[in-house]
């Protein structure tokens, strides 16, 4: 499965738009990460625990987006974008969305 943030895929011709596909993950904070985040907010610097958590969540959202495209019989997903939103105190949602398409064989 080809997936891209661009609207086209170089060297490939889109023959059909299958539809919008999404993949999302709701991730909750871990108390241990919160303690480290509190310390980092005082002294500054990257909060690696959160960076790793969000990277894992983004990767899982992409996997779910690709699975959705496969279920619809798509060859690729173009125009992928990401959104992040707070769901409740201590958790957030990462959503990946794009357009599933069929390519000329």
UniProtKB/Swiss-Prot annotation:
Gene3D superfamilies found in the cross-reference section: Hypothetical protein apc22750. Chain B (3.30.110.70)
Domain of life: Bacteria
InterPro entries given in the database record: UPF0145_dom_sf, UPF0145_YbjQ-like
Listed Pfam families: YbjQ_1
Family from the record: Belongs to the UPF0145 family.
Protein name: UPF0145 protein Ping_0381
């Amino acid at each position: 499965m080809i997936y891209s943030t661009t609207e086209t895929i170089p060297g490939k011709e889109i023959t059909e738009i299958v539809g919008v596909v999404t993949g999302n993950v709701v991730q909750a904070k871990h108390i241990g990460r919160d303690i480290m985040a509190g310390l980092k907010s005082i002294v500054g610097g990257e909060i690696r625990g959160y960076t790793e958590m969000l990277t894992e969540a983004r990767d899982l959202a992409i996997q779910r987006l690709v699975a959705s495209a496969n279920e619809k019989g798509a060859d690729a997903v173009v125009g992928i974008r990401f959104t992040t939103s707070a769901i409740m105190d201590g958790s957030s949602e990462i959503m990946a969305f794009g357009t599933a398409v069929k390519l000329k064989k």
